[in-house]
From Swiss-Prot:
Family of the protein in this entry: Belongs to the GatZ/KbaZ family. KbaZ subfamily.
NCBIfam families: agaZ_gatZ (TIGR02810), PRK15458.1 (NF012002)
Primary role: Component of the tagatose-1,6-bisphosphate aldolase KbaYZ that is required for full activity and stability of the Y subunit. Could have a chaperone-like function for the proper and stable folding of KbaY. When expressed alone, KbaZ does not show any aldolase activity.
Name this polypeptide is given: D-tagatose-1,6-bisphosphate aldolase subunit KbaZ
Pathway: Carbohydrate metabolism; D-tagatose 6-phosphate degradation; D-glyceraldehyde 3-phosphate and glycerone phosphate from D-tagatose 6-phosphate: step 2/2
Length: 426
C-alpha cells in the first residue's frame, strides 16, 4: 500500500501529479467513483470523516470496520482490485467530543484511531486543532502537535499489532474554517501563511521526536492548509495562484511533503489543475459529488412528472422536503434567511446539507419508486436532452445507456473526471 508515498515521490520529482479523495458514504457516489477509477485504471482514495464514521457509529451508523466492509463489498461486486483501494480517515481527533473535558475527549480519540487503524485504513489525518470543554481557545501549536503525536503513537502500535508492520501514511494540520463548507457568506479567504505552515510542521516534528516517532516523519506525506478555496451556500471562492505563491514555494523545501487541500468542491477544472501544479496535490471532494447526485435525482423527478400520472409519481422532492422539515437538525443551524431562502437552500445550496438525508427510509423508498417508474419503459430522448443535456450527448453517441441508474452515475462521474484530469500530471 504505497500508492500515496509513490505519488508524492513522483510529484516531488516534477511530475505535477496528484490524487483526489472521495469523501462520501453514499452508495451511488461510491459506485460512480469505483467504476470511474476502474475504467481509468487508477488507484482510488476513499475517505470517511470522524463525523460520519467512528467507534460508536457516527452519523452514518457505521464503525470504521463497517465502512471498510461496505466499501470492499462494493468494490468486489464491481471487480475493482482491493490493492488499488486506499481508505483514509479525515479529521481524526477529538472533533466529535469538543463538549467534553480534554482528557475524556482524547481518550475517545485514542479509541477512534485504534478503530480506524485496526479496520485497515492506511491514510490517517491527525487533527487535534479543536478546543475541548476545558481548553483555551484557540489551542497553541504545541498542544495541538502533542495531541497529534499521542494519536500517532496509538496508530503505530495498533497497526503493528494488527498487521505486523507500521505502513500508515499521515496527514497533519487543519484548514480554517470548519470542515464541510463555510456557514457564513464569504467574499474572500485568508491563505495559510508560510510561517504558520512552518510553525505547524516544526511543532509536530518536535512533538513526534518527544514520543520517539522520528522514524515515521517520511510517512507524514501532507500538511492540510488553506490555499484560498472555499464555498458557501451560493458562492465559490476561486483559487488565486498569486495569493498562494509563497505558500506553494515553501513546501518545495520539504522533500517528502506536499499539501492537502480541503473544500475544493465547485472549483473550475482550471483551478483544480493549478492547485495540483502548485503542490496542493491531494484534493478533497465530497459535497460536489452528492450535489451532482441531487441534481440528477431532481432532473429524473422532473422527467417522471412529465411521464407518470401524478397519483403514481414517487413525489421524491416533496418527500425530501417533508423529512427535512420534520428533522431539521442537519440544516437549521446552517441555512438562514426567510422561509423562501431556507427552502431554496434545502434543495440547492452548495453546502448540500441534503446529503445527510438520503439514507432516510422514506426518502430511500421514494428514490426506489422513482427509479422503478422510469425503468419500466425507455425515457424519451427529448426529455433527457431537456433535463440532463450532458448525458444526452453521450446517450446519442452510444456511450451511455439511458437508464435512471446509469444517468445518475454518469452525472456524478462528470465531476470525478475534472478531478482525474487535474491529478494526471505530465
Amino acid at each position: 500500500m504505497k500508492h500515496l508515498t509513490e505519488m508524492v515521490r513522483q510529484h516531488k520529482a516534477g511530475k505535477t501529479n496528484g490524487i483526489y479523495a472521495v469523501c462520501s458514504a453514499h452508495p451511488l457516489v461510491l459506485e460512480a467513483a469505483i467504476r470511474y477509477a476502474s475504467a481509468n485504471q487508477t488507484p482510488l482514495l476513499i475517505e470517511a470523516t470522524s463525523n460520519q464514521v467512528d467507534q460508536f457509529g457516527g452519523y452514518t451508523g457505521m464503525t470504521p470496520a463497517d465502512f471498510r466492509g461496505f466499501v470492499c463489498q462494493l468494490a468486489d461486486s464491481l471487480n475493482f482490485p482491493q490493492d488499488a483501494l486506499i481508505l483514509g480517515g479525515d479529521h481524526l481527533g477529538p472533533n466529535r467530543w469538543q463538549n467534553l473535558p480534554a482528557a475524556q475527549a482524547m481518550a475517545n480519540a485514542d479509541d477512534l484511531i485504534k478503530s480506524y487503524v485496526a479496520a485497515g485504513f492506511k491514510k490517517i489525518h491527525l487533527d487535534c486543532s479543536m478546543s475541548c470543554q476545558d481548553d483555551p481557545i484557540p489551542l497553541t501549536d504545541d498542544i495541538v502537535a502533542e495531541r497529534a503525536a499521542r494519536l500517532a503513537k496509538v496508530a503505530e502500535e495498533t497497526c503493528r499489532e494488527h498487521f505486523g508492520e507500521a505502513d500508515l501514511e499521515y496527514v497533519i494540520g487543519t484548514e480554517v474554517p470548519v470542515p464541510g463548507g463555510a456557514h457564513e457568506t464569504l467574499s474572500e479567504l485568508a491563505v495559510t501563511t508560510p510561517d504558520a505552515a512552518r510553525a505547524t510542521l516544526e511543532a509536530h516534528r518536535h512533538a513526534f521526536e518527544k514520543q520517539g516517532l522520528n522514524a515515521i516523519w517520511p510517512r507524514i506525506i501532507a500538511l492540510v492548509v488553506q490555499p484560498g478555496v472555499e464555498f458557501d451556500h451560493t458562492n465559490v471562492i476561486d483559487y488565486q495562484p498569486a495569493k498562494a505563491a509563497a505558500l506553494s514555494q515553501m513546501v518545495e523545501n520539504y522533500e517528502t511533503l506536499i499539501f492537502e487541500a480541503h473544500s475544493t468542491d465547485y472549483q473550475t477544472p482550471q483551478s483544480l489543475r493549478q492547485l495540483v501544479i502548485d503542490h496542493f496535490a491531494i484534493l478533497k471532494v465530497g459535497p460536489a459529488l452528492t450535489f451532482a447526485l441531487r441534481e440528477a435525482l431532481f432532473s429524473l423527478a422532473a422527467i417522471e412528472e412529465e411521464l407518470v400520472p401524478a397519483k403514481a409519481c414517487s413525489g421524491l422532492r416533496q418527500v425530501l422536503e417533508n423529512v427535512m422539515l420534520d428533522r431539521p437538525e442537519y440544516w437549521q443551524s446552517h441555512y438562514h434567511g426567510d422561509g423562501n431562502a431556507r427552502r431554496l437552500a434545502r434543495g440547492y445550496s452548495y453546502s448540500d446539507r441534503v446529503r445527510y438525508y438520503w439514507p432516510d427510509s422514506q426518502i430511500d423508498d421514494a428514490f426506489a419508486h422513482l427509479v422503478r417508474n422510469l425503468a419500466d419503459s425507455p425515457i424519451p430522448l427529448p426529455l433527457i436532452s431537456q433535463y440532463l443535456p450532458l448525458q444526452y450527448v453521450k446517450v446519442r453517441s452510444g456511450e451511455l445507456q439511458p437508464t435512471p441508474r446509469e444517468l445518475i452515475i454518469n452525472h456524478i462521474q462528470d465531476i470525478l473526471a475534472q478531478y482525474h484530469t487535474a491529478c494526471e500530471g505530465q
